Amino acid sequence: MLGNSAHFGRWDILQFETAGKTGLTLRYIIGDATRPEGTGPQLLVHVCNDIGGWGRGFVMALSKVSRKPEEAYKRWSAGETDQPFQLGEVQFVYVSEEFTVANLIGQHDIARRNRPTAEPPVRYEAIRRGLRQVRAWAQTRGGSVHMPRIGAGLAGGDWGRIESIILEELVAHGLPVTVYDLIETRGEAPWLPDRSAWPPG
């Protein structure tokens, strides 16, 4: 794993590169995933739950940028589309000509303070199946893939395991992937999340 840091105007970027089978990289930067860097078609991937809940975590920031992903997800969860609403499915929502959001169902239910789950809501195989759909979409359109640390926030997943899935399903197939950490404290290590307690607050 190689580390480099630089200042790029809008963001302080802390970049780590993990070599995939193709020699391409999974890139980490400090920035806002709802406003991906670069040009050309951009696909923003995030993880949703399978009960139709949209109201905590990353989706709140996403809805401030555009309500389209939220509105499409709610129609989907209400059975108003032909696509099955189930783990491993992905809904592609066109926000603008160059920006699409992938609502990937990779979480079963949600964690609640008054009803702890027997295991974290994350479902790794659902994320893997969803990323295969993401791969097909991005390869067809020649786009870049962007995401927060999917499945490792409220879903309670282990990022090391999820990172391996991303490398296998996206990077190893020649897709450029950027992972965003939204961190304000300079020098904090974004790759060392606190997993001391479950469920998350």
Feature-to-residue mapping (PLM):
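Macrodomain-like recognition of ADP-ribose-binding/processing modules
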Residues: 2-201
